[in-house]
């Protein structure tokens, strides 16, 4: 058994798209990032990589490489899954905490879990998804923290 932890955050700006868990979320603000800025998938990618000492998303997909400009974060997550599965790992469970003040994510919970289930190839009862706000301490950012449990 192995456990991995990942974390990511991005500044939010007016007029940018907000991607979370692979979905475009209706929002007046979105992530300022080199890729699509999906903090949720970035944290999950880092969690998978950390479980096997494979570095992090910045090592595999550096923001200095123009190939990754605007890239969908699903590409990064799929590669991290491929790398751990090549080592005989099976993803058993994922837990994710998303912190942002706006927009409220409650109305999108089902769609977000559906997307994570599809991307991670896990049943929905093996995915934990928690929403938090910064209580006004950091209203212009999104943060994601992820923990994964793998067998192998």
From Swiss-Prot:
Keyword line: Isoprene biosynthesis, Lyase, Metal-binding
Site positions per UniProt: Transition state stabilizer: 34, 133
A GO BP entry: isopentenyl diphosphate biosynthetic process, methylerythritol 4-phosphate pathway
Cofactor note: Binds 1 divalent metal cation per subunit.
The EC number(s) this enzyme carries: 4.6.1.12
Catalytic activity: 4-CDP-2-C-methyl-D-erythritol 2-phosphate = 2-C-methyl-D-erythritol 2,4-cyclic diphosphate + CMP
Pfam family for this entry, one: YgbB
Binding site for a divalent metal cation: 8, 10, 42
Temperature dependence: Thermostable.
Annotated binding of 4-CDP-2-C-methyl-D-erythritol 2-phosphate, by residue: 8-10, 34-35, 56-58, 61-65, 100-106, 131-135
GO terms of molecular function: 2-C-methyl-D-erythritol 2,4-cyclodiphosphate synthase activity; metal ion binding
Cofactor entry: a divalent metal cation
Pathway(s) per entry: Isoprenoid biosynthesis; isopentenyl diphosphate biosynthesis via DXP pathway; isopentenyl diphosphate from 1-deoxy-D-xylulose 5-phosphate: step 4/6
Keyword Lyase: yes
SUPFAM superfamilies: IpsF-like
Family: Belongs to the IspF family.
Function: Involved in the biosynthesis of isopentenyl diphosphate (IPP) and dimethylallyl diphosphate (DMAPP), two major building blocks of isoprenoid compounds. Catalyzes the conversion of 4-diphosphocytidyl-2-C-methyl-D-erythritol 2-phosphate (CDP-ME2P) to 2-C-methyl-D-erythritol 2,4-cyclodiphosphate (ME-CPP) with a corresponding release of cytidine 5-monophosphate (CMP).
Known partners and oligomeric status: Homotrimer.
Name this polypeptide is given: 2-C-methyl-D-erythritol 2,4-cyclodiphosphate synthase
Species whose genome carries this gene: Thermus thermophilus (strain ATCC 27634 / DSM 579 / HB8)
